[in-house]
């Protein structure tokens, strides 16, 4: 599970609850069925109108992506894999990688290696893999757009709910107590609209965009790795090239780990 999503939501509700207590607001004030209906049902309705059915059906999948930790290869794991494959390909030829392909779980990487072993040109492989990444990125952007739009609609619907509440409040002009209660209830819709829009929907969209960028970056590393192996580049050259995709701090850490492993190997050989 992606703990940051869950922790963020919990902290948001805690912050709202503590703020209400400090301001002396009763939790029962939020129990406003009309406001909840306007915000939740209104937001859902607006999103359904704005997007085609095919994209709306993917919403449950988007929630799984939000709350599920991605179990993907990391760049740190890919670098030694490509170094090993490059060494094998230089020593025995690309066909020697056929056995290694079976051990690859990532479908994108497996397809790239298969095309390389089949003798496809570097340009063809780059075009195919790049187009696949672009198509994936478009799908991800479409999913994030649903939550972005929901975050845009919710606060506006909150204003709509407040206006409806104020219209209802005007019917109690002859009763000061009822008028005050009606006005406070009118702004519950605004609170819910702003809260769901800027604490849930917009952050959800941002999380999807960040996860998409991470996956795109990983795919770019795979493309460069496959093409480098195809071109017969030295393992050390491939390692240095792919390390550029890591932050400086992670590159240094990777280098230190590599030196430690080399030291252990020398001790074993001695």
Curated annotation (Swiss-Prot):
Query: Could you tell me which Pfam families the record lists for this protein?
Result: MotA_ExbB, MotA_N
Q: Which GO terms describe its cellular component?
A: plasma membrane
* InterPro entries assigned to the protein according to its UniProt record, in alphabetical order: Flag_MotA_CS, MotA-like, MotA_ExbB_proton_chnl, MotA_N
In its keyword annotation, does this UniProt entry include Transmembrane?
yes
Topology feature Cytoplasmic, residues: 204-270
Main location per the UniProt record: membrane
> What does the record note on quaternary structure?
Each stator complex is composed of 4 MotA and 2 MotB subunits. 2 A subunits and 1 B subunit are thought to form a single ion channel, so that each stator complex contains two channels.
Name used for this protein in its record? Motility protein A
Species of origin reads: Bacillus subtilis (strain 168)
Q: Which gene encodes it?
A: motA
